[in-house]
Each structure stands twice: as C-alpha cells, then as structure tokens.
Amino acid sequence: MNIQALINDKVSQALEAAGAPAGSPAAVRQSAKPQFGDYQANGVMGVAKKLGTNPREFAQKVLDVLDLDGIASKTEIAGPGFINIFLSEEFLAKQAEAALADSRLGVAADEAQTIVADYSAPNVAKEMHVGHLRSTIIGDAVVRTLEFLGHKVIRANHIGDWGTQFGMLIANLERVQQESGEVSMELADLEGFYRESKKLYDEDEEFAVKARNYVVKLQSGDEFCAEMWKKLVDVTMIQNQRNYDRLNVSLSRDDVMGESMYNDMLPKIVADLKAQGLAVEDDGAQVVFLEEFKNKDGEAMGVIVQKRDGGFLYTTTDIACAKYRYEELGADRVLYFIDSRQHQHLMQAWTIVRKAGYVPESVSLEHHAFGMMLGKDGKPFKTRAGGTVRLADLLDEAEVRAAQLIESKNPELAEDEKKAIANTVAMAAVKYADLSKHRTTDYVFDWDNMLAFEGNTAPYMQYAYTRVASVFAKAGVSMDDLQGEIKITDEKEKALIAKLMQFEEAVQSVAREGQPHIMCSYLFELAGQFSSFYEACPILVAEDEAVKQSRLKLAALTAKTIKQGLSLLGIDTLERM
C-alpha cells in the first residue's frame, strides 16, 4: 500500500471540505524527524495564503474534518501550519501482515501504460566503453521498476548502425575476408578494426574511393553491402550482449532498434515538414527555424533536417524515431536515457515533433539525463595512458578486486563458491556505485568506496540481506512458515515497520522520476532501521514465543523487501558472503 498517497487523498478531501479550492495540493511528505510524526501535510499554508486566512486557524479547520480513523493515532498542528500525522501501531501491524502475505509485498499494480525506454545505445564496430555504463544500468533499473508496476515496457536499444563510416568498414571487412577466408564472428578487437579501417581510408586513395562507393551502394540497398553491414552489426551485438549478460542487464538482440530502422521515413518527414511550412530552404539545406531557441544574436535558431547534398542528420532521425514510437508502438510515455550534453538537441527535435503534430501533448517525451563518470582527479574517467576504458576491462578488474576481497573475508570457502560470490559482488558494486548517485550529477569512480562493506554500497546492502537471512538459519525455520500475528511492543519495531511500509513510495518515485538512487537510499535507510531493531529487540531469545514469531515476521519482511528492491536495480542477493 502507498500510505503517502492514501493520506494525501484524505488530506485533499479535508482541504476541500474546509473551503479550499478543488484540486489544492495537500503536499503530504514523509516526516524528516520522528518527533514530527510519520507524515506531514505541508499544503495548508499555501491554501491559507490564497484564501487570505490565518494558516494555523485554517489548519485546525482541516483537522476538524480530516478522517484518519483506523490510520493515525494522533494528528497535531506544528509551526506556522504544518499538520503532523502519527500512524497507529494497529494500522502499521495490519499493513505489515498484508505485505508479508503478498508476493508483491503490498505494492499495487499501476494502470498499465505502454512505455518506450531508449537506453544503452552503443555504436556498431566499436566496443562498449565506460561512457555507455550509466545509460545502460540506469535505464535498466527504471525499466525493471516500471515492469514490476505492471506497465508494458518496450526496450529500445538505439544503436549507432548507420552513417558514412560504414563504407570504409565494409571495404575493410571485404579485404579481410579475401585475405583470410570467412571472418570469425569474434572480431576480437573491434576498436583495432575500426582504427585500421580509418587508417586505410586516410592513406590509400583506391581504398577510399571504394569506401565512398560502398556508402552510396549501402544506402541504395545493394545486396552485398547490406550483407556485410549486417555482419558488422551481428559481431558488435554479440560482444555487447556479453557485457549485458555480465551486468545482469535485461537487454537482448530483440531490443535493437538502430538508427537504420528509420531510414525510409526520413525523405517523407522532410517533405511533410516542407508542406507544412515548417522546413524552408536556407543556403541549399532544409531548415526549421525555432523561435523557442535563440542563437547568440538573439535570432530564431535554425535546425537543419536535410543537408544541401541531400543527406539527413541525427535530428531528422530523432524526429522519425519519436513519430514511430507514438504511431507504431503506441507509446504513452517515451523515456530517453541519454547524457545531459544532448539535452538541447533532443528538445529541438521534440519541438519540431510537436509543431508537426507527430506526437500529441498527451504523450510524455522525457529526457532522463545523466552526468559524467569521473576519475579521482575530477576529470572524465580514463586509463592510465589517457585512453577510453573498455567496459569489459572495467568488469574484469571489478571481478579481480572482488575476488581479493572475498578471499580476505572468507578464505575457507570452496573455490567455485568464492568465484561465484566475487562475480556477484563485483557486478553489484559497479552498478550500485552508479545507481546510488543522483543521476544528473557527475560522480567519482572509486574502487575502494564501491567495494567497501560500510556505507551506502552494494557489498553493505548484500551483506545486510545475508545478515537478516542468517536469522532464519539460526532459528531453524523458513521465512515462509511463520505463525502468529505481528504485534508492536517496542518503538524500534514501529520505526522498522514504518520504513518497510514506505517501499511502494520508493518504487513509485523511481518509476515517476527515473531516479534509481531513490531506491538505493530507501534500502540503505531500511538496513539501518533493521540494525537498530536487531540491537534493541532480541529475536531468537525474545521474552515469549509470540514476540519471537512477530519479530521473525519483521525480519522476513525486511529480507524480502531488500531482495525485491535490489532485484529492481538488477542486483542479485547472496545467501552467504
């Protein structure tokens, strides 16, 4: 149950009954401190100001008609007109019982929407590097959360699979095939192959002529060029899939929707923009001038949709892409997990999309931007030699470091178990270090911090789960075979349940805002609340069997909530570490 939403509705009804205009925001939030209750309604002051009345007097009017029977044990007016709400122990215990009995932990499904999520988007014939990490794992965490809430999510891996560079790549692939027979689908060093192709293009005129010819042929649908192009795409996506699988990312080959998919739409879109009077000729190119964006001289900015040589640009593809996602995929929301430097480009494309009537305002186009991954020096994360860090190399190093960590903690474990634990911890550490940061900020990549067993880290959260799970091993009972009712006998129990009941609020926030760090913060706070409860409230040596069973139920709900929360982030738990 979303208790925040429930109370928000109740306060909204009371506001209206007390004389507030319909639709006035109740602004119910989780309280910052226990002395202010579990929730606080902050909307009274704004409404009182509009009505020209005393906020505290108006707050009292609201309280007089606020019906929280069976939910709150106490309400009070605080400060200039806040309403503090204290949940009743009976209500909390009842909600905890219901959550424990529900495989969804009490999280209600949303009214299903069709949501397209554009994330990862590596380039063909290039290896994935650390710059692809944020889009890939942030997007995947949000996608998992949306699916958990019952939405139909269409993953769109908008790979860079088109452009003039394919002429030289096809020409080089043909050369390799002629020299060594059929090309292995490994093509182990894609970066090297790309560099070699570029070198040949720059230094060998005969090769360059052939490459330029292949660009034209590919764009004209030539069978040989199309076959070679597909081979390059296949080789790249096989390699990328290894990274996705290692990272426990839910993308597959079926989710690829590359730039090339929209090629046939581009001429029609430019023709339509011209027919609507949106695109005009300027210096031989087709340009849409947007009053919403100004250049440095304060003039309407021109966005080129077709070059003077007839070629199309990324903006044209992005216009086609948004149109396709609405018209063909039936999207209600489209989420783009693309770095913050692309914001203006996207806004311009979407402005054209709206003006042309391709996507109605009822469909939400959302740029979920993210910052950069930095080294300890505060500069973009690079190798010691100053090069781009391959994603596969980063994951390899994470596994080596995690293996050393597990060896130092548990040298007595069997080798295969140590390896399995190390791999799980390694991928979790890389992902959680990123996901736990607000996505719009840059963050510093630090091996020591991400593999620490203290603080808001993956190892800490995975250990928190194993610690709770170990209680049941010691008790000799299953989490799913507990008797009796949950009864609150201590403030620490109440605080733990109150935090457990905020799980749905965290899930909804991640889905709404595209911010996985909200879930990380919630789980970290939950682990802290469990530690306080565990220290203050003996479980295995509780004063009687009823209290023991009740506390075991709270431990079970905590374990299940941590496991489910980490699962939504694409992170696995371990039964022992």
Swiss-Prot record:
Catalyzed reaction equations: tRNA(Arg) + L-arginine + ATP = L-arginyl-tRNA(Arg) + AMP + diphosphate
Coiled-coil parts of chain: none
GO biological process: arginyl-tRNA aminoacylation
Subcellular location: Cytoplasm
Sequence motif 'HIGH' region, residues: 122-132
Keywords linked to the UniProt accession: Aminoacyl-tRNA synthetase, ATP-binding, Cytoplasm, Ligase, Nucleotide-binding, Protein biosynthesis
GO cellular component, one term: cytoplasm
Main location: cytoplasm
Pfam families attached to this UniProt entry: Arg_tRNA_synt_N, DALR_1, tRNA-synt_1d
GO molecular function: arginine-tRNA ligase activity; ATP binding
Highest taxon of source: Bacteria
SMART domains: Arg_tRNA_synt_N (SM01016), DALR_1 (SM00836)
Family: Belongs to the class-I aminoacyl-tRNA synthetase family.
Subunit organization: Monomer.
The protein, known as: Arginine--tRNA ligase
Source organism per UniProt: Vibrio campbellii (strain ATCC BAA-1116)
Lineage: Bacteria, Pseudomonadati, Pseudomonadota, Gammaproteobacteria, Vibrionales
